[in-house]
Regions:
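Charged C-terminal helix
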Residues: 245-281
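Short, small-residue alpha-helix embedded
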Residues: 146, 221-244
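Conserved phosphate/ATP/ADP-binding segment of small-molecule kinases
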Residues: 118-212
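Short pre-catalytic strand/loop immediately N-terminal to key active-site residues, enriched for Gly-Thr
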Residues: 12-13, 210-224
């Protein structure tokens, strides 16, 4: 059993963020802890929302944990709401990394070629700083474009451009990268670039080179929180010893099966009720 810390927002009315990730990681055999970056009334797509940042709580909590000697095998960061939060979490992750903790960064910012409602260019800069401390980061294609300043193309990329984008993300400081919701040579896919040395806490197989691409058939139904589900399944498998490509395939299968089972749900903003679907993990 690995000790995993999630640093992300908590949304009151939706299965997204930590609400989606915690039951998955627990089901996969890990002990899960949390440090909320904000309390959010509902997903931002509704147009009306209330957000209470928890920066002061975070600032007070981290020294307490340090004094008590709490240790984590992995930490996964998500949405940051201020420069102060990003610096606080970035410094904490660097300290944990020096102690042997694996750092995962989900640079939550946008989708479909646009930033999420309420996001700004400053958030992009903050996420670049967070990616710089990551053992593994997993942006979607839109977020990868913002991170790398590569223009978003609805038609997607060719393989050479895909590899260049992965290289650009690694150049920010991440040791390995996944890009979800990508489109390469006319096929929907997830892209990966593995480290040329073993990542902390999980195995690699570079016999077929550092890059990989896994195609998938898109289901014409979208839900909030599927990125969080993807991340949680990948982290759970990686921390159980699977390599990056195996973990990516497991995540893709779980997300596909969850969407298929819940495709008749009316409000996509509510996300997927993961607690009712743990058998699909």
């Amino acid at each position: 059993m690995k000790q995993i810390l999630l640093i992300n927002d908590v949304v009151g009315r939706s299965h997204v963020g930590m609400v989606a990730m915690m039951p998955i990681l627990t089901y996969l055999g890990h002990a899960v802890y949390n440090l909320p970056t904000a309390l959010v009334s509902n997903t931002l797509d509704y147009g009306h929302f209330n957000v209470m940042e928890t920066t002061e709580y975070m600032r007070g909590t981290l020294p307490v944990w340090q004094r008590l000697g709490f240790r984590f095998d992995a930490v996964c960061t998500g949405l940051m709401f201020s420069e102060e939060q990003a610096k606080l979490v970035g410094d904490y992750c660097r300290r944990l990394a020096a102690e042997g903790t694996t750092v995962f960064v989900d640079p939550i910012m946008g989708d479909g070629g646009h930033l999420y409602n309420g996001m700004s260019q400053r958030q992009v800069e903050l996420m670049r700083e967070m990616v710089s401390v990551a053992d593994l980061t997993f942006p979607n294609y839109t977020e990868a474009c913002y991170l790398t300043d590569i223009p978003f193309r609805k038609e997607g990329m060719d393989w050479e451009d895909a590899c260049r984008m992965l290289d650009a993300i690694v150049a920010l400081g991440a040791r390995s990268a996944l890009i979800t919701s990508a489109r390469v040579n006319g096929r929907n896919c997830v892209l990966g670039r593995r480290s040329d040395s073993p990542l902390l806490g999980f195995s690699q197989n570079l016999a077929d080179g550092p890059y990989f691409k896994i195609d998938y058939e898109e289901i014409p139904r979208a839900f909030h929180g599927t990125g969080d589900i993807f991340s949680a399944v990948a982290i759970g498998h990686l921390m159980n010893g699977d390599n990056l490509k195996q973990s990516t395939m497991a995540s893709m299968n779980v997300v596909s099966n969850l969407i298929e089972r819940n495709r008749e749900q009316d409000d996509a903003c509510l996300g997927i009720p993961i607690e009712k679907c743990l058998d699909l993990l």
